[in-house]
């Protein structure tokens, strides 16, 4: 079993290394000793060793790179846990989807039902029978974590909260959340209401990727409603300028939970901490995980969406060659200092390629491997545009050519 190091150990190691370094004030004050031994030769491709992740006081947790999806560290990440108000990440996803496709508008007025008004737990203080704009309810849910605002949104989109929960589960299925099931929109405890740290991280990544126009709501520090100032419960928003979301959660049975995203120098990380013993513990754990990821890893973009990777000959086609590439940006995350060792290999799934090909048709695979040969990513190669068949003479000539291929 790998021993986890406390977050303070990283600072201590750095201090000792600095004090011992030639030219440091401490080293200069030390009496001269024997001549230092020559350094041990290190291969140029070797990276500094990556230490164990920091010790985290929580039931389960995960650290994931947003762009590559690589898990940098985790503990019991697939264990079922109560999500508490992290449930509202999926509520937000469903509402954002309704906004994006025009079924809902930010200015739509939602009538507050008695069911929403009587919601237990945290509140936005909306009153039964009043009409409240959707954009205010979104802030009430995301910033204040109000259960009343959350249920009002669920009823506005789904008709009833029960019907909305079915929509949540369908989106969970589409996003590949294999350890998640919802029975309500706000996260109050129920035996059939559960998730996992990995699923929460996957959902957080989907929110950032699919709804960049709405994601800034998660960084709103406070807002006013009914002359009540309502603040964001995510304390890291005020402590780390790179943190720009996502959501807190807490019930007595779930403990203190926090899903966090931060962006530094183009690298975005997502951490999820479930079942911490206190607000302080969940924030310290999240900060330590993010610091670990940014200190010891880096993410690079290897290919851009629709970038041509191969231009193979296409038989029986109107044009002799076709552009084959990747359908989306390709990223990988490696230990710092190892980016130069990353290699890519493009391989067609069958040869020769014969027209017609449709745009987006899968024709191969791009493999990404590190210096040791370990495969990091597998990305489909697709036809970047349609390749129609050529004329009768072209098809006849290539039919003969294929006999000798």
Language model features with spans:
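Positively charged n-region of N-terminal signal peptides that target proteins for export
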Residues: 1-4
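Sterically constrained small-residue positions within well-ordered secondary structures
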Residues: 10, 52-54, 74, 262, ...
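Bacterial N-terminal signal peptides
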Residues: 7-17
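Active-site-adjacent loops and short helices of periplasmic peptidoglycan-processing enzymes
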Residues: 21-211, 222-226
């Amino acid at each position: 079993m790998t021993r986890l190091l406390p977050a303070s150990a990283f600072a201590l190691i750095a201090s000792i290394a600095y004090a011992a370094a030639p030219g440091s004030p401490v080293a200069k004050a030390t009496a001269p000793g024997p001549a230092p031994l020559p350094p041990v030769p290190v291969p140029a491709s070797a990276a500094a060793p990556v230490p164990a992740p920091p010790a985290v006081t929580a039931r389960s947790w995960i650290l994931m790179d947003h762009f590559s999806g690589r898990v940098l560290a985790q503990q019991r990440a697939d264990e079922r846990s109560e999500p508490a108000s992290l449930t509202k990440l999926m509520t937000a996803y469903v509402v954002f989807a309704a906004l994006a496709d025009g079924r809902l508008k930010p200015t739509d007025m939602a009538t507050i039902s008695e069911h929403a008004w009587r919601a237990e737990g945290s509140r936005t203080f909306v009153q039964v029978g009043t009409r409240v704009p959707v954009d205010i309810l979104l802030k009430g849910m995301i910033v204040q974590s109000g259960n009343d605002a959350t249920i009002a949104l669920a009823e506005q989109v789904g008709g009833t909260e029960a019907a909305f929960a079915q929509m949540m589960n369908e989106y969970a299925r589409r996003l590949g959340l294999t350890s998640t099931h919802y029975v309500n929109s706000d996260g109050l405890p129920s035996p059939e209401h559960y998730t996992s740290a990995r699923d929460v991280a996957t959902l957080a990544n989907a929110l950032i990727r699919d709804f960049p126009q709405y994601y800034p709501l998660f960084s709103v520090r406070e807002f006013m409603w009914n002359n009540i100032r309502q603040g964001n419960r995510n304390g890291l928003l005020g402590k780390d300028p790179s943190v720009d979301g996502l959501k807190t959660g807490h019930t007595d049975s779930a403990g203190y939970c926090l899903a966090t995203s931060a962006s530094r120098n183009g690298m975005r990380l997502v951490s999820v901490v479930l079942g911490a013993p206190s607000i302080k513990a969940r924030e310290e754990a999240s900060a330590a995980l993010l610091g670990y990821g940014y200190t010891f890893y880096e993410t690079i973009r290897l290919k851009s969406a629709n970038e041509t990777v191969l231009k193979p000959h296409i038989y029986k086609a109107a044009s002799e060659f076709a552009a084959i590439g990747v359908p989306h940006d390709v990223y990988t995350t490696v230990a710092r200092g190892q980016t130069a060792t990353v290699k890519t290999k493009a391989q067609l799934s069958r040869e020769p390629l014969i027209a017609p090909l449709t745009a987006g048709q899968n024709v191969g695979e791009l493999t990404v491997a590190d210096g040791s040969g370990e495969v990091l990513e597998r990305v489909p190669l697709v036809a970047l545009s349609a390749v129609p068949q050529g004329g009768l003479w072209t098809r006849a000539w290539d039919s003969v050519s294929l006999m000798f291929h």
